[in-house]
Amino acid sequence: YPAGFFNAYREIALDEDIDLVLHLGDYLYEYGAGGYGTEDAKKLNRAVDPINEIVSLDDYRKRHALYKTDEDLQLLHSQKPMIPVWDDHEFANDSWKNGAENHSYDEGYFSTRKANALKAYYEWMPIRESNSKLKIWRKFEIGNLFQLFMLDTRSIYRDKQLNFDNYFKNGLFDKKQYIKDLQKKRNLVGTEQFKWLDKNINNKFKWSIIGQQILLSPTVLPKIFSELDKNSFP
């Protein structure tokens, strides 16, 4: 929102060939004025509300409400059904089950912040609240064409991610310690969610689609912007 406009949402809303929208998270960002992605907010007349980083329930509600004021986003929701799932920024940057990179002790218990984010999410997003608010994984069947599984890889079972900065000593990378830590029993989706997915995948569908928040494989992108003048682009 503060970093730019949602014209892509408008194009999706107006495309009659699109019947369903999947949103895989980072629907909003938690940063306050002066934080990540807000450099052009004043120039674009898209200041964040509240101006602080969102932590309380009222904060999260206001930020959701702010995003919903965008006319292109409103159009998208009015024209297309959306199946959403959260990523990290619906809570805080690089969140995991017991914390987040962008959460500090002076902001209170992360569990409280997480509960605030969850409540606001279910209030403002097109999704039914489950008996257990954290269990967002669910399955959709679209005729006999495809089955869609929406998973959680952020908030329920995810262990704290390794920080590469912790493995540099005297300018050298401690590969031995990194490999040792990497081989520990670490979790991402959890036993319960994995068993649910394994049990519910049905071969009668032509396609089985998994919607979740993180990359499953390395991504190679062309070095377009390093070769061209960045001032040539808006």
Model-assigned labels for residue ranges:
Residues 1-234:
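Metal-dependent phosphoester/phosphodiester hydrolase catalytic core
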